[in-house]
Amino acid sequence: KREKFIITLIDGQLVIAGSDRRGTIYGIYELSQQMGVSPWYDWADVPVEHHDSIFVNKGIYTDGEPAVRYRGIFLNDEAPCLTSWVKNTYGTEYGDHRFYQRVFELILRLRGNMMWPAMWSWAFYADDAENEKTADEMGVVMSTSHHEPMARNHQEYARNRKGWGPWN
């Protein structure tokens, strides 16, 4: 089974176990959501509920394996709104690993596992070497759309048009 988790008590200890790394992540975020943390807490300013204590019922909780293998979002038409927000928030002209870490967390909290990165003026792999590493460490599969064959986008080509040899 893939991306499956269980939450249970064993000898009075809370155990969250996943069939794989994303399964474990989903189990942790499920418990977080049951404690009142919205998947959107960071993006939509959803307040996190305060609890003086939490309790876990005996038994095993699981949602089972996802019915759809790849689930995610495509950051489309990001300019000017998202690109301006990133510049004002992080001081960069591109989505760096700090920005994508927040996006990846949202995707995982929503039980997604995939993302198609922004492409107008950004180049996911070329802009910040930490982007790819962050996606891998967080368990998010990167994909590309019609505009980015072989995971390379127009910006990478435009920036290096003269530097890739006579076959351009």
Predicted regions and their residues:
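Contiguous, structured surface segment used for ligand recognition
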Residues: 1-65
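Aromatic-lined carbohydrate-binding surfaces of glycoside hydrolases
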Residues: 47, 67-168
